[in-house]
Protein backbone atom coordinates (compact mmCIF):
# COMPACT_ATOMS: atom_id res chain seq x y z
CA UNK A 1 0.00 0.00 0.00
CA UNK A 2 1.00 3.63 -0.39
CA UNK A 3 1.11 4.04 3.40
CA UNK A 4 3.35 1.00 3.83
CA UNK A 5 5.76 2.35 1.19
CA UNK A 6 6.18 5.47 3.31
CA UNK A 7 6.74 3.47 6.49
CA UNK A 8 9.34 1.21 4.85
CA UNK A 9 11.14 4.14 3.21
CA UNK A 10 11.34 5.98 6.55
CA UNK A 11 12.67 2.86 8.30
CA UNK A 12 15.33 2.24 5.65
CA UNK A 13 16.35 5.92 5.68
CA UNK A 14 16.87 5.75 9.45
CA UNK A 15 19.19 2.74 8.96
CA UNK A 16 21.16 4.22 6.04
CA UNK A 17 21.07 8.03 6.39
CA UNK A 18 23.81 8.54 3.79
CA UNK A 19 21.57 7.12 1.03
CA UNK A 20 18.71 8.87 -0.75
CA UNK A 21 15.82 6.59 0.21
CA UNK A 22 12.35 7.65 -0.85
CA UNK A 23 8.83 6.47 -1.34
CA UNK A 24 7.63 6.59 -4.95
CA UNK A 25 3.91 6.30 -5.66
CA UNK A 26 1.72 7.68 -8.43
CA UNK A 27 1.24 11.02 -6.67
CA UNK A 28 5.01 11.58 -6.35
CA UNK A 29 7.17 13.37 -8.89
CA UNK A 30 9.08 11.02 -11.25
CA UNK A 31 12.28 12.89 -10.32
CA UNK A 32 11.98 11.39 -6.82
CA UNK A 33 12.32 7.95 -8.37
CA UNK A 34 15.25 8.95 -10.56
CA UNK A 35 17.18 10.64 -7.75
CA UNK A 36 16.81 7.79 -5.23
CA UNK A 37 19.47 5.28 -4.28
CA UNK A 38 16.60 3.16 -2.96
CA UNK A 39 12.98 3.70 -3.96
CA UNK A 40 10.10 1.95 -2.22
CA UNK A 41 7.10 1.69 -4.50
CA UNK A 42 4.00 -0.30 -5.39
CA UNK A 43 3.67 -2.58 -8.40
CA UNK A 44 1.11 -0.19 -9.81
CA UNK A 45 3.20 2.98 -9.32
CA UNK A 46 6.47 1.59 -10.69
CA UNK A 47 4.81 -0.69 -13.22
CA UNK A 48 4.06 -0.44 -16.92
CA UNK A 49 5.53 2.55 -18.77
CA UNK A 50 7.73 3.58 -15.83
CA UNK A 51 11.38 3.44 -16.86
CA UNK A 52 13.87 3.15 -14.01
CA UNK A 53 17.35 3.64 -15.49
CA UNK A 54 20.14 1.82 -13.67
CA UNK A 55 17.81 -0.35 -11.58
CA UNK A 56 20.04 -3.06 -10.13
CA UNK A 57 17.76 -4.86 -7.69
CA UNK A 58 14.01 -5.25 -7.59
CA UNK A 59 12.60 -6.73 -4.37
CA UNK A 60 8.95 -7.70 -4.63
CA UNK A 61 7.30 -8.19 -1.24
CA UNK A 62 3.82 -9.03 -2.59
CA UNK A 63 2.83 -12.66 -3.09
CA UNK A 64 1.66 -12.45 -6.67
CA UNK A 65 0.29 -15.29 -8.78
CA UNK A 66 -0.53 -13.36 -11.96
CA UNK A 67 1.75 -14.27 -14.87
CA UNK A 68 1.30 -10.80 -16.35
CA UNK A 69 1.94 -9.03 -13.03
CA UNK A 70 5.05 -11.08 -12.30
CA UNK A 71 6.40 -10.55 -15.82
CA UNK A 72 5.73 -6.84 -15.47
CA UNK A 73 7.64 -6.69 -12.17
CA UNK A 74 10.54 -8.70 -13.61
CA UNK A 75 10.50 -6.44 -16.66
CA UNK A 76 11.49 -3.40 -14.58
CA UNK A 77 15.05 -4.69 -14.78
CA UNK A 78 17.11 -3.97 -17.88
CA UNK A 79 20.68 -4.57 -19.05
CA UNK A 80 22.86 -2.09 -17.17
CA UNK A 81 24.66 -0.16 -19.91
CA UNK A 82 26.66 1.93 -17.43
CA UNK A 83 27.69 -1.13 -15.39
CA UNK A 84 28.40 -3.92 -17.90
CA UNK A 85 29.82 -6.30 -15.27
CA UNK A 86 26.74 -6.19 -13.06
CA UNK A 87 23.71 -8.43 -13.58
CA UNK A 88 20.42 -7.01 -12.25
CA UNK A 89 18.63 -9.15 -9.66
CA UNK A 90 14.93 -9.78 -9.11
CA UNK A 91 14.18 -10.94 -5.57
CA UNK A 92 10.88 -11.96 -4.01
CA UNK A 93 9.73 -13.34 -0.69
CA UNK A 94 7.95 -16.66 -0.11
CA UNK A 95 6.49 -17.97 3.13
CA UNK A 96 6.76 -21.76 3.07
CA UNK A 97 3.93 -21.99 5.63
CA UNK A 98 1.40 -20.47 3.22
CA UNK A 99 0.34 -22.84 0.41
CA UNK A 100 -0.53 -20.00 -2.00
CA UNK A 101 2.98 -18.55 -1.57
CA UNK A 102 4.46 -21.91 -2.58
CA UNK A 103 2.10 -22.11 -5.56
CA UNK A 104 3.03 -18.58 -6.69
CA UNK A 105 6.74 -19.35 -6.28
CA UNK A 106 6.41 -22.48 -8.43
CA UNK A 107 4.64 -20.42 -11.09
CA UNK A 108 7.46 -17.87 -11.06
CA UNK A 109 10.07 -20.59 -11.51
CA UNK A 110 8.14 -21.91 -14.51
CA UNK A 111 7.20 -18.54 -16.02
CA UNK A 112 10.65 -16.98 -15.59
CA UNK A 113 12.59 -19.98 -16.94
CA UNK A 114 13.08 -18.43 -20.38
CA UNK A 115 13.46 -14.86 -19.08
CA UNK A 116 16.27 -15.07 -16.50
CA UNK A 117 19.89 -16.23 -16.47
CA UNK A 118 19.36 -18.28 -13.31
CA UNK A 119 16.83 -18.84 -10.55
CA UNK A 120 18.03 -19.59 -7.01
CA UNK A 121 15.94 -20.34 -3.95
CA UNK A 122 17.49 -19.22 -0.68
CA UNK A 123 16.00 -20.46 2.57
CA UNK A 124 16.22 -18.53 5.83
CA UNK A 125 15.71 -20.06 9.24
CA UNK A 126 13.48 -17.23 10.40
CA UNK A 127 10.29 -15.53 9.40
CA UNK A 128 10.00 -11.89 8.45
Question: PLM features: what roles do these ranges have?
Answer:
Residues 7-9, 80-86, 127-128:
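Repeat-unit-sized solenoid/scaffold elements
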Residues 20-23, 121:
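A structural preference for short, hydrophobic beta-strand core positions in alpha/beta folds
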Residues 17, 53-54, 115:
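Short, structured coil segments at secondary-structure junctions
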Residues 109-128:
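Charged phosphate-binding loop/patch that engages nucleotide di/tri-phosphates or the phosphate backbone
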